[in-house]
């Protein structure tokens, strides 16, 4: 039994709240190592880079919050933390540099405005994601937000769900836009329609077993189950309990739901679920998701008459509490006080009447966190990085901004593209489902150890999901913009997945991965790789690139680009 299972067997993580007042009086050094782990049941993480200071991960179901809640969080960040708030890829926020002495007061403030950090860490159901424009978009086929709220209420603080083998990520969406990365979730519900008793019924298809991070990557697979909205909590809770009772509890990197699905297979898992429900399961309906992808950044008409929502880009998701507090005031002035967080490190101000839209767009903060960023900045996502995460190998947020700004200058007319940074294999930046994914690492360059990345391309979620392929290794971050400058124009989303007629053709396999050969010595080290060539990802530092590529069938064409024509069947 691993050490986390041992400490859970001694005391349920939820019981640690009874000890927090004592910890606050005695200081962080009085907290045992086991209790440091148990504090994660309440979203408190003692970070190695900042001894004595905690990060708090706040649960915000579906990313939907209100101005009074945001103002409370901003006050906490300024008065008890370092004044910085990070918007995460799970639609929640993180506060930093908090002292255990202040936690009781922090909890009191948060409880007073209806927010909590309960079960946002370790072996629990994490913040449940949903479409950030649920209830607003005309593309919504079925109400997903109500199900997110109901399931969150059912599992939060419930000891039936406080001792899972590993964390469980859930997403529920009723929208046709592919915005929640359903295939990366342990459990996902996506909009579907089914004929039941001669009636057309809208509900959800269920996907299980997706994961990014340690232990390998896996795309969630259909369970062949359709569920009506009224049964979502019942069915999802039984899936969670199946995982609780049958998931492996040995090697931590092999304990996710994905490994139970791999061991049992979807058919056995479905049968076990049917037995627990004591009811016949309905087969999957027609998946109502489109091939379109949206970061929900921009100005969009709501399905409610004369109202719009405005999606603002917060570069790499980091914002000072003073500015977020002012945005909360803007949401009150021009909307109804709602603020929503998206999966792409951004925020949304909904319910803006037509007559107020012009005034909103003139606000200095709306111009700073713009609703019309460049294509490169719009799709930029980053994990926290080494500044605050002990797992990260490089600083991602500042690197991501630096590279993006360089590419903006060099490629002002670039088409839509997603560029995601992860600082370690845990993959919190979702680099494996991006057009271009960047995974941080350290490499030795001469006598120095420098920040570098492996480059992945062609990832996507949705009705035709695919994990990105590693195409290049060991690219120093200081030279990354120069490398990507030649990749981006030929590998934007439209280039990788061209649109033909009304259907979105996924014909990456028919396209060559073309990378230019510059005359500079550094460019000669760049190693492109076609998706289906049977060679390993090419090292940035390998010598004799052209010779190697020519031996594999790559040739320089009339435009000075390397490409390879490959037959596909």
What is the predicted role of each segment?
Residues 502, 506-569:
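Append "and occasionally in soluble cytosolic enzymes with long acidic Gly/Pro-rich linkers
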Residues 1-508:
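Peripheral terminal and linker regions in Fe-S/redox and tRNA-modifying enzymes
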């Amino acid at each position: 039994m691993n050490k986390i299972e041992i400490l859970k067997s001694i005391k349920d993580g939820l019981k640690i709240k009874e000890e927090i007042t004592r910890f606050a009086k005695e200081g962080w050094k009085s907290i045992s190592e086991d209790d440091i782990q148990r504090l994660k049941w309440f979203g408190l993480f003692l970070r190695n880079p900042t001894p004595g200071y905690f990060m708090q991960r706040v649960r915000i179901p579906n990313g939907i919050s209100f101005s009074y809640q945001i103002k409370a969080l901003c006050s906490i960040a300024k008065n008890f933390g370092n004044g910085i708030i990070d918007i995460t890829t799970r639609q929640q926020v993180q506060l930093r540099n908090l002292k255990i002495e202040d936690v009781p007061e922090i909890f009191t403030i948060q409880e007073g405005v209806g927010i909590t950090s309960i079960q946002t860490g370790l072996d629990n159901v994490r913040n449940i994601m949903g479409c950030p424009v649920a209830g607003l978009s005309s593309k919504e086929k079925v109400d997903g937000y109500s199900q997110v709220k109901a399931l969150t209420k059912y599992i939060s603080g419930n000891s039936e769900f406080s001792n899972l083998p590993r964390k469980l990520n859930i997403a529920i969406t009723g929208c046709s836009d592919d915005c929640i990365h359903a295939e990366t979730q342990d459990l996902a519900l996506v909009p579907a329609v089914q004929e039941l008793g001669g009636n057309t019924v809208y509900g959800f298809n269920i996907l299980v077993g997706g994961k990014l991070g340690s232990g390998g990557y896996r795309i969630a697979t259909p369970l062949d189950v359709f569920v009506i909205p009224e049964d979502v909590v019942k069915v999802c809770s039984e899936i969670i309990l199946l995982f609780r009772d049958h998931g492996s509890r040995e090697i931590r990197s092999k304990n996710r739901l994905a490994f139970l699905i791999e061991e049992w297979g979807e058919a056995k898992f479905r049968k076990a679920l049917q037995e627990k429900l004591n009811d016949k399961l309905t087969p999957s309906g027609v998946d109502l998701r489109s091939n379109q992808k949206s970061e929900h950044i921009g100005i969009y008409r709501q399905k409610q008459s004369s109202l719009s929502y405005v999606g603002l880009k917060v570069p790499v998701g980091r914002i000072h509490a003073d500015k977020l507090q002012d945005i909360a005031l803007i949401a009150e002035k021009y909307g109804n006080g709602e603020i929503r967080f998206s999966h792409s490190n951004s925020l949304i101000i909904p319910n803006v009447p037509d007559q107020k839209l012009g005034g909103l767009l003139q606000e200095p903060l709306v111009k700073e966190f713009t609703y019309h960023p460049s294509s490169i900045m719009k799709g930029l996502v980053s994990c926290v990085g080494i500044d605050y995460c002990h797992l990260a190998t490089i600083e991602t947020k500042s690197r991501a901004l630096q590279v993006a700004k360089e590419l903006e200058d060099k490629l002002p007319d670039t088409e839509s593209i997603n560029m995601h940074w992860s600082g370690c294999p845990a993959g919190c930046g979702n680099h494996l489902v991006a057009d271009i994914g960047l995974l941080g690492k350290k490499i030795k360059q001469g006598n120095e150890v420098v920040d570098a990345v492996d480059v992945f391309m062609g990832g996507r979620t949705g009705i035709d999901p695919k994990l990105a392929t590693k195409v290049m290794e060991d690219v120093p971050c200081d030279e990354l913009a120069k490398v990507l400058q030649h990749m981006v124009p030929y590998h934007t989303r439209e280039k990788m997945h061209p649109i033909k007629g009304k259907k979105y053709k996924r014909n990456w396999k028919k396209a060559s991965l073309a990378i230019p050969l510059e005359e500079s010595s550094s460019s000669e080290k760049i190693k492109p790789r076609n998706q289906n060539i049977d060679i390993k990802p090419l090292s940035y530092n390998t010598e004799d690139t052209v010779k190697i590529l020519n031996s594999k069938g790559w040739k320089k064409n009339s435009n000075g680009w390397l490409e390879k024509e490959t037959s596909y069947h």
